[in-house]
Every structure is written in structure tokens, then in C-alpha cells.
């Protein structure tokens, strides 16, 4: 593995360009496996609302390297991923390291106590290597299985040792990291029923100060040394045992449903499988008339009669990684809502939602990873991304795939948060409308994107990561 890497930077442009990809791609015949769902009509939104971005964003080239890219929520975790690249790691190694790191610096959104969905794909062979979903069936107890999913992916495809992969996150937890705006904003989601440890910790935080997480560092060190089994049946079992019975902890399992695939509008589209938002996402992209300029009405028409319209607003993080061997990885992880179950354990992490909404009989995960590759010219355009909420992805992906704005403007364009009863505007990305919308609570879901065109790579971090 080549040690040369790139930085997806968190500055004004937040983008990196990487060139000199050296390996030709193979051509294979693709299958057409679309997903069909019933789409009704929708009357909650009567006005056509076009989502747009009023100010163009200037882009400034970043570092040059050999086809590797990282798009993630925090620069400190991107640097952790770069560290793994420099040690000879591949995209799976890096994506796992970055995701674990985000559990340290964004503990209100993801971490050991959460779950996730991941997709691994190799573009040289055009083969899907892995789809994993750690969210259990809706209406059941949600045992935290994110670390199990990461460990499984790493065991299957990683190049470097598990110990090396966890080292950056452990170091950051021990040495400290800056309190982000996103973490401060999570106070707005604090429930009166939150445990005292979480309340006291959150109220002690100040924006921009450096804090340490020694308990979390020790927990990760145990997982580094003993493996993920320590969480469920080993020395770390006592804390989780307060919330989950021994049978649930002794029998963790991952959903290995096949990935969803579809062919449409010049692309091969790949996402996660049944039980996630993946099938509905691909169906919407293939069968819709979405373009680079579309209305909320068009999006709403897709949601009537679907469970997606009644989904709560989820939270989480998105990690997208590519390497010079054209391994593409997308990991979408979270705790459910911001702050999960509102229980901070003595082991230093927040437990995610303890129970899925029982009426969501079909969907376990509201988000999905996403990969798109052009059909006619395999090197023309490839997209690696994901999102924690289908409703956000449908406001961004059509622009990236078929619009003329480009990745940066598409990601930074205003979005509307859509719920069963209301439309909500993002505070820092307000839509241009003839009337005002109530504000959506921060922090907002991000969509971090890697785009490969020929031998050029653009890795872009959504500024909503704060």
C-alpha cells in the first residue's frame, strides 16, 4: 500500500484534490436490480419550494497524492485516518479508525454505544465486498454493535493490526480534544430524564476548550487488547449489563442482507440492503424526476404512505474513504437521536437509543451508505458518501449526480428538515423563501462526499459538522 495520502481539510473550502491515480479499471457487465415501492401523492406542502444556494463557494486545491481521500466530520479524525494511511493501511483500516475517533470527539452523535451501516466496494473489479448493518430489528432492544461491525469489516479486509487502528482514538481521548459547536449544541437535546453523569458532564463544557476522556481511553484500550468480546462478555460487560440482559449481550449479531443495487440515469447505484434506507433511496433516485433544481413538493410526493415521513429526525456521522487501489468505504453510524438514550456510562461513552419505535416494522436504520459509478465510462465519475437521513440525501444526491453545481455547492446548499407535521429550516443554511420556517434544532446531519473523476479526487467535508 502506498503511503502517500491526502487531507480532506476543514478550512474555508474544506476540500482536497488528489491526482495521479495509477491503476486502470476493469469493465464488467452490470445487473439491473431496482427496488420498487408504492409512491403516493402528498398534500401537506402546497407551495413549490426550490432549494438553492445564494452564494458561490470558492474552492482552493488541497494536497496532491495517489488516489486516496477521506471525508469526515472533524479534521482531528481525518488526521487520524491519514496516520493510518501513512502506516500502510487501506481504506477499510482508515474508515474504521476515523469512525472510532469520531466516537471520541463527537460522543453525542456516535461511539461505542451506537450502531451503524457500512459498505465496502472495489471499483477495479466492480464488486461489492461487504454490506453490514448493526442495527437490530425495529421494536427490539438496541444492543450497541457498532464496534462489532467495525471489527468484522477490519478482520475481513484490513491490512494493519486492530491495535494500530485504535491507537489514534485512544491517544486523542487521553491527550484531549477541542469542544466543538456541535457538542455544545447537544445541550438543547438534554432530557430531564438524562442520568446525572451526562447532565454534569455536558454542563461543564465550554466551546473551544480542550477536554480529555480518560475513562473512554481506558475502555478503548481494553477493546484494543481484548477485542470487541470484552464489551459483551468480558471485563466491560458490567456497565452494559445495567441496560441489557445477559442473553442479548452474549449473542450480538449483524444483519448481512445483500446490498441494494439499481441502474438508472447513467449510473450504477449501490447502497445498503433491506432494513435500512438504502432500497428506498435507490428507488427514489431511479424512479423520480429529481434534477439539479427540485421542490420540496417533489420530495414530499415520495414520502406519503411511506414510513420515512413519520421517522424522527436522526443524528450521526458519515465517513467516506477511498484508497489508491480503488477500495471505497462508506460508514454511517449514530446513537439514534442526539445523545442517544441520554445515559453516560462510567466507561466513558453514551449508550444509544435503547428501543426502536415499535411502529417502524420495516426500517431499522434511517440512514444508508451510498456509492455511484458512471456506466459508459468507468473512470468518468464515482461518488462515495452516505447520510443518516434519507430525506437529507434526497436533497443533495440528485444535484451531485445530475446537476451542474458540483459537489461543494450541492452539499452546502440549503436543506429543509421534513417531518410528518412540519418543515424546518437549518439556521446556518436558510433557504431563500417568501416566508419563514421554524428553525430545526442543531446539530444537523452531514453528508461528507468523495468524488473521483478520472485520476482526480475531491474529498469534501460538510460544513454542518461544526
Indicate residue ranges for each PLM-predicted region.
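Histidine-acidic residue clusters that define the catalytic metal-binding segment
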Residues: 197-223, 228
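Short, well-ordered strand-loop elements centered on a beta-strand within folded domains, enriched
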Residues: 125-134, 247-248, 268-270, 378-386, ...
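ATP-dependent carbohydrate kinase catalytic cores
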Residues: 75-78, 213-217, 240, 256-257
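Cofactor-centric catalytic regions
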Residues: 236, 246, 254, 260-263, ...
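Proteins synthesized as precursors that undergo proteolytic processing into mature forms
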Residues: 5, 9-202, 217, 233, ...
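Residue-level detector of beta-strand structural context in well-folded domains
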Residues: 259-260, 317, 369, 448
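Structured, charged N-terminal subsegments at the starts of enzyme catalytic cores
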Residues: 231, 238-282
